[in-house]
């Protein structure tokens, strides 16, 4: 089992946050 460093956790959280923002923006434009 590989140990996950704090840096990888931060990168994963930031990338997930960006994906959520892009998806919400795309959803708003599609619904309008």
UniProtKB/Swiss-Prot annotation:
Transmembrane segments: 3-23
GO cellular component, one term: chloroplast thylakoid membrane
Keywords annotated in UniProt: Chloroplast, Membrane, Photosynthesis, Photosystem I, Plastid, Thylakoid, Transmembrane, Transmembrane helix
Localization, UniProt: Plastid, Chloroplast thylakoid membrane
Biological process according to GO: photosynthesis
Pfam families given in the database record: PsaM (PF07465)
Major site of localization recorded for this protein: plastid
Topology of the protein relative to the lipid bilayer: Single-pass membrane protein
Protein family per UniProt: Belongs to the PsaM family.
NCBIfam families in alphabetical order: PS_I_psaM
Designated name of the protein: Photosystem I reaction center subunit XII
Gene of this entry: psaM
